[in-house]
Design a protein with these regions (language model features):
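Pyridoxal 5′-phosphate
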Residues: 1-140
Length: 140
């Protein structure tokens, strides 16, 4: 139960937990930027001040739809304003996607997230291109 979970975290050490979460966040931000370039907007605080959370949007994609597509890929995230509407308003956005990895998550799972986001973005770009041109690719 809850008591055992607390004992488990105390055995690991909260400083170690925070260090690992920040490491996952740093790796995730780097990978998302490498994978999606200018198309990703990351709103998380810098990893040295964060708690491992990755908050982001992909330009042109609705956060709720993005979260739904990630769910279809077996990746759990949240979308919306996350009880932080004033923060979202100050960022000039209404909602975002949030991935909240913890000590049971791995670097490989962060890679899965980046790969899935690229796949979803590519599907969207192909669909958008098809709607605009009636063709699935520019050379067709």
């Amino acid at each position: 139960g809850l008591g055992e979970a607390a004992r488990y975290l105390m055995r690991i050490g909260m400083d170690n937990v925070l260090e690992y979460l920040r490491s996952l966040q740093s790796y995730g931000e780097k990978l998302l930027r490498e994978t999606l370039g200018d198309e990703i907007e990351i709103y998380s605080p810098p990893p040295d001040r964060g708690a491992g959370v990755l908050s982001f949007n992909i330009k042109g994609l609705d956060p709720h739809q993005l979260a739904f597509q990630l769910d279809l890929e077996g990746i759990a995230v949240r979308s919306g304003h996350h009880c932080a509407y004033p923060l979202h308003r100050s960022l000039g956005i209404e909602k975002s996607v949030r991935a909240s990895p913890h000590i049971y998550n791995t670097y490989e799972e962060i890679e899965r997230l980046a790969t899935a986001l690229a796949r979803i973005r590519n599907r969207y770009v192909s669909t958008k291109s098809f709607i605009a041109t009636g063709r699935l690719c520019s050379s067709c």
